[in-house]
């Protein structure tokens, strides 16, 4: 460009500081974007692209949006993967000569979206940072700037790190430049959508990070945060603080003290387990409906919705904490009236965590304060209802809830019931809140009346009947007296202008009024905004009280949600202890039962321990319910550990430290792994990390290779789990390899189970009931028929199966698969012979019975015998 205006020079100087962000440059009532930013933004936002210097040789692309409605536009740009730098006018244009000073006040990134209205209410919006040592210890820090939650942990190994990151689902991940490629490889193929941002290596220096954290939290040591001896955690948390300080420009005072958590405090769930058990999203479409969260989440606040997600992803392993949750949920199930009242009151509580953060960052409007006030007004009733409960956890929650009546009264006195969104156009504050504001409003509303009254008062005081009070734009307000009455003018009148036939005066009272009325409109709006800012700061000073209350309400909301589900779905309180037992009577799959698919859900038992019933080998046809049964056991176990009641007639569950699942498999082309390689990698992870307190769900092992290889690997895996005392984990092992049912011959803690099936008119009926013993047939061809394979294919499959099962061989010793049944007749299909007439004692007894010779009593006895045989 040959010649730049002062404004464009200012723009380019600021843009140079934020080259990786789209710059929203404030010009009056608009944010303008120029050059490449304008081209990019206009395309994403679908707004008009125009230009400055239109028609000139060097046009400057330009687009803009109204400043007061910018948030949806910012959200769309961030969703598209861009950062947005918000550049504001930091001087009043009315008081400045020349160019107005402008500064970037914040940078919005995927992990630092501060406008909660554009976020999913019941999900956190985490910014994460990862630091890794040469020994592969990973520090992981996460911050939700919209709630102030700041947590950090250290884990060991790639699998644990990847699993933790996936459970948090951050929107943005910070890494040092030298570790960026390593972390990208770590998370390759993981289920999640995030932006990875590199930080300069010096930012992640351990000493610098420690000092940065101490400065940020104004403390002399990190000991109180529990991370002083966790160097990678300190580096990760220090990276987060650096990024926040660089982008948020000193408005992060609401961030809570750093909380260090450890994996040993929670049940370990790897990424595969979270995905396969569909804890918070389904495998089919990633939706919430059809997941465990979709069933258990009946929370009525956004805070509770985020909290229950955390509880599901991080089940407890501390018996006392688990029992406290169970006792509270159980009491709330029984106290239906109290439960209903509490849920009704909580339903009127807004998202206090995010409102509190908006206020602390100076982004809250008057409607946000009204929402805060309405929420505070619910607290005394909530505390009153909590007094009716006796469970220790409920009492603890009550002690953490601050009624905040002083804040509710303050906001109620200050802010009108239905304030406008815009803060600088008045109408925010209540009458009677501030004396000067009331006077300015009175002047604005009653200016003519005041002038008329002053005129009448002065006429009476002076006795001049023709005295007039007038106004013009040149001289302002004045009192006009004709020359014939100048002798009656009081001493306090001061001459302002002389005319041919009159004199114009002012008094101190009129001068004061003039100053008030001429500046009343601007002063009114400015004062009201100042008063609002002052009020917002006063509320922000109480942020810690609000945070504590919000945390307690979120926990209460989760307990109420679990109680509501337990009551309506007939859940029971499990017995939990430190044993190795896992006994569930009439257990039900919580999600499938709730989906009401038109089929009565058949409950099933499980009885496992590490002494006699360690490994359950489950056989049966596809679609019979093996996977449902195993997932059901895993979900009930997880629910018990998170503090929920469980779908069963009764349950006795010893503490479980980990749940592993290996369910199905598919190619991982991104990492160059075949189906079989994925399967073996998952199996290796289980065998290397399981303990005697773990629960393992294996749904098919060895399917991705040849039959003999698959059987060999599956057998060896089962033996390893059985024979190695340091593993010896309770295992549910579903398989189509019927050879594995012979494990009971060599492994004393292996038991066989199968899914009951019945035949009827060459159709199979899935009874969905788990019974002892191995399955007699796989019924694969019948399942293929149910799937809709052509009749010709089904018939041909039967012929081939006959050849295989009869052992017919060709001359070269291979199975004679091509052999067809002679004479166009199909051979009988042994796969369908559940009721072989030659071997079925029920058929034999029925065939030998002469019903004409027996009495009714003998008939009943005979039926009783048959029933025992069946």
UniProtKB/Swiss-Prot annotation:
GO terms for biological process: mismatch repair. ATP binds at residues 620-627. It comes from the Bacteria. PROSITE patterns: DNA_MISMATCH_REPAIR_2. The keyword ATP-binding applies. The keyword DNA repair applies. One of its GO terms (molecular function) is ATP binding. One of its GO terms (cellular component) is cytosol. Keywords: ATP-binding, DNA damage, DNA repair, DNA-binding, Nucleotide-binding. Belongs to the DNA mismatch repair MutS family. This protein is involved in the repair of mismatches in DNA. It is possible that it carries out the mismatch recognition step. This protein has a weak ATPase activity. HAMAP family: MutS (MF_00096). This is DNA mismatch repair protein MutS. It comes from Syntrophotalea carbinolica (strain DSM 2380 / NBRC 103641 / GraBd1) (Pelobacter carbinolicus).
